[in-house]
Amino acid sequence: MPTPGNILCLPHNPAAFSEMLEIVAALMQSGRYHPIFIFDGSGYDAAMQVCEQQGITYCITRKPSASNRSQPGDAGATKRPQRRSNASRIFSWVKKTFLVQLVLAWFQYALVWRRARRLLNTLNPQALLLIGDRHIGLETALVELANRRGIPSLIIPFALSDRDSAAVYRLAMPDWRRTYGMERWLNRMVVRLHPEWGFTQNGETLLWQPPAAVLAAAFWRMMPANPWVLGGGAGWVMAVESHHSKDNFILQGMSDEKITIAGKPRYDRAAKIWQQRVEARQHLCAEWGIDPEKKLLVCAVPQLGEHDLLPWDQHWAETEFLFSVFSDLLPHTNVVLSLHPKSNFAEYAPRAERYGLVIAHQSYDQLIPISDVFVAAYSSTVTLAIAAHIPVIVVDFHNFDYDFFNDVKGIIIVRQREKFVSTLQHILKDQAFYQQLVDGQARAAQFWARFDGKATQRILDLIGDLVTRGEEIRKLPPRERRTQLPPWSR
């Protein structure tokens, strides 16, 4: 029996790790492949524990570095200002100059390039499994080096993504005008030289990353051709969850030929639960100590603080508002909270307990199929609610105004706090209105998700095809290999 071939799985962040687990488990079960998780950076402690428990191989490419980013527990804390020496001030100023930043970025990416090359030399993979091909760093370095060797790459995005949301995220940064905007002549010059690295949102042209970063990345062939699109780099194929996802990426400029509709592997388990939702609901409600006959509201707690979209004090204020509204629904309606992998359970648990709310330890794909109403921010989890015909309230009190769900008749977007309670009551108490929303989700479901429980198998078949194609290309002389790659990967 041949030795299973290595598949390198680069999740990019802990949330992506959770989404990749279904595929990795299926790869191991097939016996044909040996998946290896690549953890690059910090935040993967829980992921490493899961790997050890399930016997999954993983590799740490570099030691996690301490972060100065504020944590939830720091919100509102008062820090005593420290006096800085003149030498410290001068050093800080020098670090901000373009030439120094360019040199630092060049050496940083040189080290990344070296790590990527060592991974490929040591592990000799048959394919790469990624969540994108545009994240400058190990992701784009692996894709470029793999393309040179004829090693295929498969992108499986797990989150909603478009250029507008990426721009809104940058516009929320305190110093966005100098960092990403056109205030500095360097930024303007780079956009003139490479218009594809810029994007205009609300009349403001933004650079994907600061000038030093994109220029250094371009030198090392790590800069994606179209960074504002999740699949805008040099990966071979992208497997998306639905017709909506495919249309969305094509609208952003991706090639139709690069995209295939496979469904979302994480939803395979959800599809089975949905088919047996009565029994599944009774089981979980018994575990939580709540009545399964009462209506069940599931809330994916927004992560505006975790994603730096709000200061932590404002994030907690928003969270407390939602919790207080949910508390008022008790005991006539059951409420269960679902936390994002980036969220710290210890920070949320006391607040939830104060309002008498349950935080589920189960993942969202176990909760949404058994719910009656789903509340979330703009989240990819909403697509599962569409697939399961569950009415949704999207809370957008800060008017991010993404247009992901504007045309879905089973989703209500609430942009004003004062309308949230009345909207909830309307859904929970007006059965005719509730049924309208259910019917709206049912009509949208075929366009938004492939919910047949076969997505993982389609992904495995696709990986098999790519591995075979890669083996054929690697038989060619090195100079001919690149010509046989997809046009966007050459």
Model-derived features: positions:
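Conserved catalytic-core segment of nucleotide-activated headgroup transferases in glycan assembly
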Residues: 20, 26, 259, 265-347
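Active-site and donor-binding regions of nucleotide-sugar-utilizing enzymes
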Residues: 8-28, 38-54, 60-269
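A donor-sugar binding/catalytic signature common to diverse glycosyltransferases
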Residues: 163, 240, 245, 250, ...
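A generic structural motif
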Residues: 29-37, 330-335, 357
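Catalytic binding pocket for nucleotide-activated donors in carbohydrate/polymer assembly enzymes
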Residues: 349-353, 380-450
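Donor nucleotide-activated moiety binding/catalytic core segment of transferases
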Residues: 113-114, 120, 336-388
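C-terminal amphipathic helix plus adjacent low-complexity
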Residues: 302, 417-490
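Structural motif
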Residues: 6, 126-127, 237, 296, ...
